[in-house]
Design a protein with these regions (language model features):
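Short, positively charged and aromatic/hydrophobic N-terminal segments
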Residues: 11, 16-22
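Short Fe-S-cluster ligation motifs
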Residues: 99-117
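Thiol-based oxidoreductase modules, predominantly thioredoxin-like and allied folds used
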Residues: 65, 89-104
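Local sequence-structure signature of Cys/Sec-based thiol-disulfide redox active-site neighborhoods
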Residues: 50-87
């Protein structure tokens, strides 16, 4: 019989045994979320109101809508980070898990046809272009955002 490495922990006076791989999974997931914050550190965190203002004022701006808990957002953020470092582009980030933004974000996503995250928007002269595709290459990201 094969032995399984178990760890013991307690939570609210209840004892649990979990396989050792479980803690590695939790640790890895935490590291991935930390990496997400590292990847978006050069983006300007903003609000839905700012995105709508850019559209209304016919500015040129690019927005990434995402969340740390989304594996597709983390994948996209890593590529976007490389593009931002290379091009020195100014890109905004809207956190789709921000509680104060949920209603506004839902309305914004409905208005501009953003079905899921990661959402990537480019605004130019009042025209809004949207892509929700974590498989975009760095070259596709540059082309989409006119970088």
């Amino acid at each position: 019989m094969r032995s399984t490495n178990l760890i013991f922990f307690s939570y609210q006076n209840t004892a649990f045994f979990r396989p050792l791989w479980h803690t590695r999974f939790i640790r890895k997931r935490g590291n991935l979320m930390e990496q997400f914050f590292e990847d978006i550190k050069d983006l300007e965190v903003t609000t839905v109101a700012r995105a709508q203002e850019a559209i209304d004022q016919k500015e040129t701006a690019t927005f990434f809508i995402g969340r740390k808990t989304c594996p597709y957002c983390r994948k996209f953020a890593a590529k976007l980070a490389t593009v931002v470092v290379e091009t020195k582009a100014h890109i905004y980030f809207i956190n789709s898990e921000e509680p104060s933004q949920l209603d506004a974000l839902q309305a914004f996503r409905s208005t501009y046809g953003i079905p899921t995250v990661p959402g990537f928007l480019h605004v130019e002269a009042g025209d809004v272009t949207v892509r929700c595709d974590s498989s975009m290459s760095e070259e596709e990201i540059k082309a989409f955002a006119h970088l």
